[in-house]
Amino acid sequence: MAKIISIIGSTGSIGRQTLEAAKNLGIKVAALSANSNIDLLEKQVHEFKPDVVSVGNSELAKEMSNRLQGFGIEVLWGQDGMKRVVEHSEADTVVTSVVGTAGLIPTIHAIRHKKNIALANKETLVTAGQLVMEDAKKNNVKIFPVDSEHSAIYQCLLGNKDKQVEKIILTASGGPFRGKNIKELKNITPAQALKHPNWSMGNKITIDSATLMNKGLEVIEAKWLFQRDLDSIQVLVHPQSIIHSMVQYVDGSVMAQLGSPDMRIPIQLALTYPDRCQNNFNKLDFLKCPPLTFEEPDIDTFKCLRLAYKSLEIGGTMPAALNAANEIAVAAFLENHIGFTEIAETIEQVMQRHNVNICPCLEDIIEVDCWARTTARQLII
C-alpha cells in the first residue's frame, strides 16, 4: 500500500478523485502538479499541504508563489517542475494522471528514481511502451493500472500462470453514438460527444470514448502492460459497463471483474494493492442490474479503433504518430474547427505520411510526437 504519493495532473478528473481516495485512506501527499487551474490547485494545497507544487508556465508559477507566501511551499513550473514533483524523496508512489504525452517524460523520470507508478496516463505506454516497461523492470518498479479495464485485467490475472492465458477481453461501452452510421456521425457536436452514457471523465478521454479511440489506446496499453500479442487481445462492446474486462484461459474458463462504473474503485486499488480497503462507494446490486449484453465493435464506422490496431501492427513509432495526431484532432473538434468524423480522417492522413522508425529511442519518439502534431495542424488548417 502506498504511504506517501506525488500526483501529476492533480486538478483533472483522475487527480481530484485520487486526492479524495488519499484523504479517505490517510495517505500523505508530498507533491502536486497542475497545468493551468491554479484556483483549484491552491485549494488542494491548503487541504493536503504538499511540500512542492508545479504549474504549466512561469507566469502561473509567479502567481502561485504570491498566493502561497508564508506556506513554505516550493513552486516550480514546466517539465522540470513535473520532474521535481515525481522525484520527491519522500514519495513511494507517483500517480500519473496528466492527459496526453505530457506525462511521458515525467513518468520515465519517476521510474528512474525508483518510484512505483499508479498509471492513469495511457499515452505513456501507447507511445513508448517497450521503453517504459524495460525501465520499470530494470529499476524494480511496479506499475499499477488505474484505467478500469486494465485494473480489471490485472485482478483477473492474479494467481494464474501467464502461459495459461488464451486472451484478454477489453470491454467498451460503445460510447454515446453506438449504432449510428457515418452519415449520422458527421453532424455530431462537441456538446453531444461529451455526454458519455456511463462514465464521468475529462473532456479529452470522453471524446476518445465516443470515437472508440480510447479503446484503441487501451489495446496498445494492454499489449505492453501485460506483454500480450495483438491477436490475444479482443475488444467487446458491453453497453452496461458492469463487466470492466475479462481474461479467458486455455481451459475455457473466463474470469471477469465486475463493479459499478466508478473510477474511484480502480484508483483506490492502485493505491492500496495488495490490500482492499473499506469505502462508501456504491456497491453493485445484482438484483438491480440490467441484462448484460455484448456485441462486436463497428470498426468500419468508428475508424479510430481500426487505426489503433493498424498502428500496433506496424509498431515502432506509428502508435506515437497516431496518438499525437489524435490529440490535435480532438482539440480541434472541441473547438469546432473540424467535424466528428474528421478526427479519424486526420489521424489516418498523418499515419499515411509517417516514415516509421521500428526501433526508436526516447528522443526519436519525442521527435515523432512533435512531427505528427505539426502535420495534423497543417492538415486541419
UniProtKB/Swiss-Prot annotation:
Pathway: Isoprenoid biosynthesis; isopentenyl diphosphate biosynthesis via DXP pathway; isopentenyl diphosphate from 1-deoxy-D-xylulose 5-phosphate: step 1/6. Its EC number is 1.1.1.267. It catalyses: 2-C-methyl-D-erythritol 4-phosphate + NADP(+) = 1-deoxy-D-xylulose 5-phosphate + NADPH + H(+). Its cofactor is Mg(2+); Mn(2+). Keywords: Isoprene biosynthesis, Manganese, Metal-binding, NADP, Oxidoreductase. NADPH binds at T11, G12, S13, I14, N37, N121, E123, G202. Catalyzes the NADPH-dependent rearrangement and reduction of 1-deoxy-D-xylulose-5-phosphate (DXP) to 2-C-methyl-D-erythritol 4-phosphate (MEP). This is 1-deoxy-D-xylulose 5-phosphate reductoisomerase. It comes from Ruminiclostridium cellulolyticum (strain ATCC 35319 / DSM 5812 / JCM 6584 / H10) (Clostridium cellulolyticum). The gene is dxr.
